[in-house]
Amino acid sequence: MSVSVKRISTGTQVVAALPASEDPVEFPAEYFAKNPGKIPVFISTRLDLDKLRQYVYMGLTTGEVNVCHINSYLYRVLQNIEDEARDNWVSFRVTIAAKDTTVRLFDMLEVKEYAGLVPDGKENANLTQTVDEWLPMYILGLQRVGRATDERYRGDLYDHLCAQCKLKSPSFESLGNPADNNYASWINDSNFLKLVAAIDMFFHHFKKHEEAVIRFGTITSRFKDCAALSTMAHLVKVTGMPVEEVMTWVLNKPVEDEVCRMMTPGQEIDKADSYMPYLIDFGLSTKSPYSSVKNPCFHFWGQLTAVLVNSARARNARVPDDIPYQELTQAALLFAYATGRSSDLAQRFVLHNKEYIKAAPDASDNSEREESKEAPTTRDVVEWLAWWDDIGQVRTRDMEVFARRAVHGILDPREKSIGAYARGYFA
């Protein structure tokens, strides 16, 4: 919808427009509306498991493994893992399993034959089935290691992976060097990513399954590119407020718009066994509506609020580019200050019927508080906005002291992080 402004000198209307520089987001429900049914994945089933085991093992050893061999091997060796559905497992009207029936690992997918060329690989006739005890976990762990950008962290992940594989099977042997990072050619393959998502989805549903330890390598698939949703969940934790109350503290138009888009109904955000958390790896969306990239104002406001209420985790969140920092900073400080000055302390249990009854508020006390412009002691956003207007929407000295105290412990923060921004702004 175009908007016009009036040119004063001539009285003519001028259309105000900006270039459409961003691709629109894609919601998971939209995918299933266009593509009802299980998610297709293309796997070659022409090679037997013995050959695939050799091709994958030798390919990882030489750094020349073929993604078709990886996909076929994972499917072959894991396809018979199963459990019993305690309830109907349905997502976006797709029935994955009926109650009290056996569900297999890849039942959320529709497996189709891969029609492309599948090359031969290097053989090793000495390999036995004992390799299958650890090789799938090793492969899936390598894709997690390969996504790590920090060299030290990548090395630590690889060490943890090897330790997990060794626990799973004493016959484990490392087949490569994490520094080589030869996994980029296959960790971005769409069929491989669908297998990764399916494996994590199954074992997230059946957390107590004896093979669930394999999630070490797949867990990053869940809620990939959903950092803004994680920010919302983190805000709920650090403020102690329910999500609906947190939303009443949204005071900026850009944040409002982003929250409304994230809360688009029918997307199964709060359904734990849904396809939704895997919207990227399942190919349901190429532009996540829940990423920090698409919700930069909400992400910044939420993480800055968390920093100001002393969340160590929020300090390392990255500062987005080109957002209204000043406006968002004011809103975050007011929210954090209200959280810090109030509490939800109340007697929850009684002994011998000794219950504290709070006295009714005195009208004279309220009028005195209004005259002195004392800050509220509740978390009611209406009371706080009234107070904010009363003081002329200018930070008080106590608010500044509160902020300085919150950032005092931030030492050597990461460059371009929320922690670095907060320390530079408030210290």
Curated annotation (Swiss-Prot):
Q: From the Swiss-Prot or TrEMBL record, what is one GO molecular function term?
A: RNA binding
Which Gene3D superfamilies does this chain map to?
Answer: Nucleoprotein, Rhabdovirus nucleocapsid protein like domain
Instruction: List localization entries.
Output: Virion; Host cytoplasm
> Could you tell me what this protein is called?
Nucleoprotein
* Disulfide pattern: none
Region annotated Interaction with the phosphoprotein sits at 351-396
**Record keywords, A-Z:** Capsid protein, Helical capsid protein, Host cytoplasm, Ribonucleoprotein, RNA-binding, Viral nucleoprotein, Virion
Q: What does this protein do?
A: Encapsidates the genome in a ratio of one N per nine ribonucleotides, protecting it from nucleases. The encapsidated genomic RNA is termed the NC and serves as template for transcription and replication. The nucleocapsid is bullet-shaped with the tip containing 8 turns of a conical spiral before reaching the helical cylindrical trunk. Nucleocapsid assembly is concomitant with replication, therefore viral replication depends on the intracellular concentration of free N, termed N(0). All replicative products are resistant to nucleases.
Source organism per UniProt = Piry virus (PIRYV)
Q: Could you describe the subunit structure of this protein?
A: Homomultimerizes to form the nucleocapsid. Binds to viral genomic RNA; this interaction contributes to the virion assembly. N in the nucleocapsid interacts (via C-terminus) with the P protein (via C-terminus); this interaction allows to package the L polymerase in the virion and positions the polymerase on the template, since P acts as a bridge between N and L. N(0) interacts with the P protein; this interaction prevents the uncontrolled aggregation of N(0). Interacts with the matrix protein (inner layer); this interaction contributes to the virion assembly. Interacts with the L polymerase.
| Family, per entry | Belongs to the vesiculovirus nucleocapsid protein family.
Q: Which residues bind RNA?
A: R144, Y153, K207, R215, K287, R318, R414
Report the InterPro entries cross-referenced here: Rhabdo_ncapsid (IPR000448), Rhabdovirus_ncapsid_C (IPR023331), Rhabdovirus_ncapsid_N (IPR023330), Rhabdovirus_nucleoprotein-like (IPR035961)
Assigned GO CC terms: helical viral capsid; host cell cytoplasm; ribonucleoprotein complex; viral nucleocapsid
